[in-house]
Amino acid sequence: EIRLSLVGSEMCIRDSNQIEKKKSEQAALVYKEWLEEISQENPNNENLNNLLDKFLNDYKNTGYTQLALLSKANFDANSNNYMDSLDNFKKLIEITNGFNGNRIYNKIARVSASRLLLSMEKHDEALEMIDLYSSSDTNGYIHELTGDILLEQGKIDLAISQYEKAANKYTDESSQTIVAMKISNIDM
């Protein structure tokens, strides 16, 4: 009886792996279409949105969907469609969150969304977007972005503190110089 259940479990796992492999192959074909469209000199936004919907509806848990969301969010931002860009970054955050998520894409999406929210003067939302990273010992860029948001909120001392943390984290001279300029501009 135990043997029978083990054999059954093994068959389910094998079938599940075959289904996932087939789904990944299908997603790869859709991604090929995606690349062809987004690589055009003037990509058709409606086609991109239709392909993105297909990814989200049929292949949500694949890396192809994450790549498509990231490239569409960047495309929208470059086309001055900031709300669409923000929406796609938020979708990317949602599917890359959690234990089995993709931390790198999640961080990229959060930082990019935060920058967009800052430009829209939605300072509290911008801070919330990166709070996961700014409250921990993180890289210089997150501290600098946090400083930018706090400065816009008029929280001068907190902004300077974040800029100083950023300067200490940066290893390249140009980033350190930029942060130093931001601090000196505050003091003026």
Model-derived regions: residue spans:
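Extracytoplasmic/periplasmic/luminal assembly and interaction segments
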Residues: 42-91
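Structural signature of alpha-solenoid helical repeat junctions
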Residues: 23-26, 44, 60-65, 84, ...
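Single conserved hydrophobic/aromatic residue that forms the stacking wall/gate
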Residues: 1-8, 12-13
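Extracytoplasmic/periplasmic C-terminal soluble domains
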Residues: 125-188
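Alpha-helical adaptor scaffolds
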Residues: 70-137, 141
